[in-house]
A protein has these predicted regions:
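N-terminal secretory signal peptides that target proteins for export/translocation
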Residues: 1-10
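Alpha-helical cap/lid subdomain in secreted, periplasmic
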Residues: 3, 35-37, 71, 75-80, ...
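Short, motif-level signal for alpha-helix interfacial/capping segments enriched in acidic residues
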Residues: 7, 25-27, 31, 234-235
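Residue-level detector of alpha-helical transmembrane segments in integral membrane proteins
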Residues: 8, 21-22, 144
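Bacterial N-terminal signal peptides
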Residues: 13-28
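Serine-esterase "nucleophile elbow" of acetyl-processing enzymes
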Residues: 24-25, 31-88, 103-111
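Acidic/histidine-rich helix-loop elements
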Residues: 51-63, 86-98, 126-133, 208
């Protein structure tokens, strides 16, 4: 009796399996969509001010930029589910992203991307020779690659956050605006919101990273929980009352979690508007 039942099951399953294999071969990749079916796919490309390696080290469970952005978009209540991929790297600039092969490995083949945020310029200015000439060229090259690899995605160049002095930031951001204008792309200008938040407290959005050797020895036991390698890393202001007088204590301008939450909040507002406009056109 059992053997009689097995045979029909096998013969019935065989054509179903064959059909499934045929569909997998015939259907284009877009049918499988992205990493999570049914979700808007968002890619973040950038340097350390997007990656957030130190906050991730200090608070591994986060939530960090990409997760906060997902949560804020979900909190709107009327938007489709969103999945955010943070493919950023400390020290990176556009030329290195392309020449190192990291873009090919980590960005080119991501399926189903809908929105790509691009925020470079700080390291490009520091490391790229003839910055004012080569940075725009590199940016145009990256945009061409993104258009080729992700023709359905909306490309969103971003200005940099206040990191260098105001004059240097303007030089970078003016070039971003120039590139975007030639490419007929809208720029997401994050700079004004971040600058406005800094007026509430000039050091409230950056972590403290300081060489241990420059901290007086009588405080070494105090800072022991914050030691990482040869330095001290503090997420926010807890040691400021004791060590804030040290020269350069506030020198590292990388965002802490509060800084990344500013970026996430402003990005969520920008993206929510785009998603609603897209929905209204349907």
């Amino acid at each position: 009796m059992k053997n009689d039942l097995l045979f029909p099951l096998k013969t019935t399953c065989a054509p179903i399996l064959a059909l499934g294999m045929m569909l997998a071969i015939v259907l284009p990749p877009s049918c499988a969509n992205a990493e999570h079916e049914g979700q808007i796919q968002i890619l973040l490309l950038g340097d350390s001010t997007t990656e957030g390696s130190v906050p991730r080290r200090l608070k591994p469970k986060g939530p960090h930029l990409e997760k906060v952005l997902e949560l804020l978009l979900a909190a709107e209540g009327d938007l489709p589910p969103c999945h955010v991929i943070n493919s950023s790297l400390s020290g990176e600039y556009i030329r290195r992203l392309i020449d190192s092969g990291r873009y090919d490995r980590k960005g080119a083949k991501l399926p189903g991307l809908d929105y790509i945020f691009i925020r470079y310029g700080l390291n490009d200015r520091a490391r790229r020779k003839e910055f004012s000439v080569n940075f725009p060229k590199d940016f145009h090259e990256l945009l061409a690659r993104l258009r080729r690899d992700h023709p359905q995605a909306l490309l969103i160049p971003m200005t940099v956050i206040p990191f260098a002095d105001e004059e240097a930031s303007k030089v970078i951001n003016d070039l971003v605006l120039e590139v975007a204008k030639k490419e007929k792309l809208a720029v997401f200008d994050i700079y004004p919101r971040y600058a406005a938040e800094l007026k509430k407290g000039p050091n409230m959005l950056n972590y403290r990273r300081y060489p241990l050797a420059r901290i007086p020895k009588q405080y070494h036991d105090l800072v022991k929980p914050f030691v990482s390698g040869s330095g001290v890393e503090v997420m926010a202001n807890e040691l400021d009352p004791i060590l804030g007088h040290l020269p350069g204590w506030y020198g590292d301008r990388h965002p802490n979690l509060a800084g990344y939450n500013v970026i996430a909040d402003e990005t969520a507002k920008y993206l929510a508007k785009l998603l609603r406009e897209k929905k209204a056109k349907r």
